[in-house]
Regions:
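Hydrophobic/aromatic-enriched cytosolic interaction surfaces used to assemble or bind macromolecules
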Residues: 1-357
Length: 357
């Protein structure tokens, strides 16, 4: 396995998003016109405690869920791209002299990494990418260094290999979200150029916040809030098991009181959390406004959630659908794809690594 946060393209592969509650997979291909085609996607639930604190808690349970998702996907492809949570990766931008040879740059990256990584370099994997010329000095380049502890990577790789698949790319979740956002930005005025966009990917227990200015990431943060709170409230209110509550949340069939007493208050809380994230960003950075909000994650499929968030924040809000202008396999239903799309941002961004579109 080449540890490559930044390697551009590889042969086709499946994007695999391992979250705290499920495994999500996306398979894309080249549409022959310089774009992407969605060939398939799948999702399989993870047993409780299979993942803990962003790491693999029970290898066998995670491998089982990966195997199940792969069978549902119905693909022959066994190569996959994985991502680490941003919390497991230390990233830093540094300046270096322009025109350095590859080996000199590698040596300097190691020296830089040594200063800010709190572990021995033997315990970490490091990768770097030259971002371009330094803003104020033509003789320097800006370099992004990413490092993660080997054990964090090895656990995920072992789970995938336990399911009979092969990891060829290791990425970072927020980089994968940014890649998928490049497909979503066409839904915004001027494709998001010269604007500040807040991407909120709402997981089961965490909100992942990524702010892009002029389509470049300027800020990332995690906030403790997620769709799991709605599931727990359904369990508590209607006396259901966790599994029953998850199914009811997605497929319906709950008493009439659900909408007014459970769902609407949850939507208001979610909108308040997004408003908090927005305030935190504008008060702690040089940017004093957000032009657009993009909602991703399972909660973004709740009907009218974009309207509720827009009302609360007074900022134009859309639901992330990275597949909206993609060719879609005939075996997939367009309407279902649109519903499922917001939860597939990371898996889609990872699958994009396999296609030179």
């Amino acid at each position: 396995l080449k540890f490559n946060f930044f390697k551009e393209k590889t042969p086709p592969l499946i994007g695999v998003d391992i979250s705290s509650t499920s495994i999500k997979m996306v398979e894309l291909s080249d549409d022959g016109r310089g774009g992407y085609r969605l060939d398939g996607y799948s999702s399989a639930p993870l047993a409780k405690d299979a993942m803990t604190d962003g790491g693999v808690g029970d290898l066998e349970k995670v491998a089982d869920a990966i195997r199940q998702a792969w069978k549902l996907l119905g693909s022959r492809e066994k190569r996959v791209a994985l991502a680490l949570p941003a919390s497991a990766v230390i990233s830093k931008k540094v300046l270096m002299m322009a025109g350095l040879r590859e080996e000199d740059m590698e040596a300097q990256v190691e020296a830089e990494a040594n200063q800010y990584i709190p572990f021995s370099l033997d315990e970490v994997n490091i990768d770097f990418q030259v971002l371009g010329a330094a803003p104020n000095n033509p003789d320097e380049v800006e370099v992004l260094i990413a490092a993660s502890r080997k054990e964090k990577i090895e656990d995920r790789v072992a789970a995938v290999e336990g399911a009979g698949l092969k990891v060829t790319v290791m990425d970072v979740e927020n980089y994968a979200t940014e890649a998928a956002y490049s497909l979503v930005s066409s839904q915004l005025p001027n494709a998001g150029r010269e604007q500040t966009v807040l991407i909120v990917d709402i997981g089961a227990s965490m909100m992942h916040i990524n702010v892009l200015h002029d389509n470049k990431s300027v800020y990332t943060r995690e906030q403790s809030f997620g769709g799991g709170q709605l599931t727990q409230e359904i369990q508590r209110r209607f006396g259901l098991s966790l599994e029953e509550a998850e199914i009811a949340k997605r497929k319906g069939g709950l008493p009439e009181s659900y909408d007014n007493e459970v769902l609407q208050p949850f939507m208001q809380t979610l909108a308040m959390e997004v408003a908090r994230a927005l305030q935190f960003f504008t008060s702690s950075t040089q940017y004093n406004r957000i032009d657009h909000i993009v909602l991703g994650g399972g909660c973004a499929a709740i009907p009218t959630i974009d309207v509720v968030v827009q009302d609360r924040t007074q900022v134009h809000t859309i639901i992330a659908n990275p597949f909206h202008s993609m060719a879609i396999s005939t075996r997939l239903k367009q309407q279902q794809v649109a519903t499922d799309a917001p939860a597939l941002l990371i898996a889609c961004g990872l699958a994009m690594r396999g296609i030179a579109a």
